[in-house]
Amino acid sequence: MLGFGEVSADEPASLVKVLVTYHSLSGNTERMAEAVADGVKGVPGTEVLLKRVGKVTADDLFSADAVVVGSPVYWSNMSGEVKTFFDNWQFKFGVFPDFKMKNKIGAAFATGGQVSSGKEVAMLTILAAMLGNQMIVVSGGGAF
């Protein structure tokens, strides 16, 4: 009998697909997205797709087991391009009303130019969009 997460020798192990997507004008968020993607590559049994939010297709989104979204901070919020990405989930990709992202893992990261630039608020708005689509958002815990 196999335990959770174990695969028998005669079954091919399926890779966990992680979509890392972002918007970046200055290049800072892009560099952070690349670092996140490199981190995913370091985890055995995963594959990563790194794309700007405007280039993500419905197939990219729906085939992912986890979605990590990065944004620069604009007025203590996600960028307009990242907001449009989430709007496209419903209006372009047809995520709702079937909740096609339900139980997929979600995560966020943000870049800001100042110590108190609103990165926490921007990440919370990204995570709120994910939670509204019944995704699973997990925190590492600890002090921030």
Feature roles, as predicted:
Residues 54-142:
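Helix-loop-strand module that forms the ligand-binding subsite of alpha/beta enzymes
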Residues 21-23, 51, 109:
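Short hydrophobic segments within beta-strands
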Residues 34-46, 131-132:
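Short helix-loop-beta junction
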Residues 15-40:
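N-terminal beta1-alpha1 ligand-phosphate binding loop
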Residues 45-55:
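A short beta-strand-loop structural module common to alpha/beta enzyme folds
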Residues 2-4, 13-15, 57, 139-144:
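Glycine-rich phosphate/pyrophosphate-binding loop and the adjoining helix
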